Amino acid sequence: MARSAYSYIRDAWKNPGDGQLAELQWQRQQEWRNEGAVERIERPTRLDKARSQGYKAKQGVIVARVSVRKGSARKRRHKAGRRSKRQGVTRITRRKDIQRVAEERASRTFPNLRVLNSYSVGQDGRQKWHEVILIDPNHPAIQNDDDLSWICADDQADRVFRGLTGAGRRNRGLSGKGKGSEKTRPSLRSNGGKGK
């Protein structure tokens, strides 16, 4: 059976540091470093991933590339005194993962749009880049689309800030079931934050 074009794209992205994609990514990242933190782009970098996440090349659907710093929290050293245990500056991490941060920043930049999903497109020593798929819930092309019209409902407003995207659900521990996931449902807060 003949392979689809998407399967070749998917195979190339399994090891983006090797082969032809490595040179292409090297050139891309030089351009990305000179761009802003949130940039609207014409078309997805990873078409296979974007399509699997719900992207369609139609009106009302846009893609934005977001860069977020890598590593742990950026915490300033305290000026006032405190005991050693409370003086921590390094090795303090946020409970929210970088992909979620990227989605939220894109949503704040485009407040009239709703985040559908996102995926990674690369990283260097300082930052990670994600592409975020955003949907216009007021566009007739979206309201009449059988696959995307659900995002127009009122209960999907601010969905990214409530952890309802794929990255948000993973970050809340909702990707697993059974043993080890007892404290993640119905929510982390209802279990005293013991789920993570």
Curated annotation (Swiss-Prot):
Residues 72-93, 163-196 are annotated as: Disordered. GO terms for cellular component: cytosolic large ribosomal subunit. GO terms for biological process: cytoplasmic translation. InterPro entries: Rbsml_eL15_core_dom_sf, Ribosomal_eL15, Ribosomal_eL15_arc, Ribosomal_eL15_CS, Ribosomal_uL23/eL15/eS24_sf. Disulfide bonds: none annotated. SUPFAM superfamilies: Ribosomal proteins S24e, L23 and L15e (SSF54189). Pfam families: Ribosomal_L15e. Belongs to the eukaryotic ribosomal protein eL15 family. This is Large ribosomal subunit protein eL15. It comes from Haloarcula marismortui (strain ATCC 43049 / DSM 3752 / JCM 8966 / VKM B-1809) (Halobacterium marismortui).
